[in-house]
Amino acid sequence: MNWTILNVSIPVYDLQKSKQFYDMLIGYNENQKLLYQSLYKNEESIFFGNKGFGLRLFKPIPDLSISNHIQSRRSYITLLVDNLENIKEKLELKDIKFIYKKSDNELFKSLYVQEPSLNLIHLVENTSGFEDHLNGWSMGLDWGIHHMNLESLNVRESIHFFCNLLGMKEGQWVAPINKGDFSIDPSELAILPLSNNNRGLHVIKPDDGFGYRNNFAHNPSIAGHPAFTIKNLSNLMAKLDEEKILYSDAKVYAMPGFHQIYLYDNNANMLEINQEV
């Protein structure tokens, strides 16, 4: 299966205040073109990126007022795929529940499903064909989505779902020489790669001592998080220091050639920001 990251959706309480926060982190693109934004026309959203690729902030509504839809109180990933009908058939054979929709103009097919650890996964197919020249990593901007980290209580079961039902392929974690204190055993940390530099989907077993052992104020193994790659991490850290926003400077510890930091946004969503060094 061909796939790429379309966007990450992050739940927020106040859209405008959150827009200001993320503008500080990655910058807001005032000249966005329209395409995939229409998938979310019934939700209150603010998009960072271009054509719906990149980042979407959304304001959740009360769950009891929802019908024929599902929302997440955690950040979740939207993937652009090339064979949604095949995935749909496999899910039906396994009697796995999902929500399937077509856009009004028939341009997009959309499917929401929960993997075994109940992370929400949104799959989208463009009926005019799969193209990867524009994606959540490469939008012609100074930032991109490096990966989405998913917490799983059974990593192998989650990987089986992604590989056997969605058609993705598991890779091998690439660790730096000065690796931090965490496990890269495939039963505790696995990767569905889009590149040879750990870009893609990360699936991790929650580790309550992760932050403590690595001297972090944050624990990136719990609750999942998106990771954004930017051009100037030191400049961002100076801004965070000025605003007195707490962050954990992990340096290069998990992925070769990537300086990573962790922080919470103004809605207590975990984030990773990194820079290739």
Specify the residue positions occupied by each region the protein language model found.
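Structured core of small recognition/catalytic domains
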Residues: R156, C163-Y253
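Vicinal oxygen chelate
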Residues: M1, T4-Y13, K33, E44-F53, S65-D142, L150, ...
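Short hydrophobic-acidic sequence motifs that mark active-site Asp/Glu residues
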Residues: G54-R56, L120, G200-H202, M270-E272
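Generic beta-structure capping elements
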Residues: K51, F58-P60, N126, I204-P206, ...
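Hydrophobic side chains in well-ordered alpha-helices
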Residues: S18-F21, I87-L91, S158-F161, L236-L240
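A short, acidic/glycine-rich surface segment
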Residues: K41, P62-S67, G129-N135, N178-D181, ...
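Core segments of cupin and vicinal oxygen chelate
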Residues: M1-N2, S9-L55, E151-G200
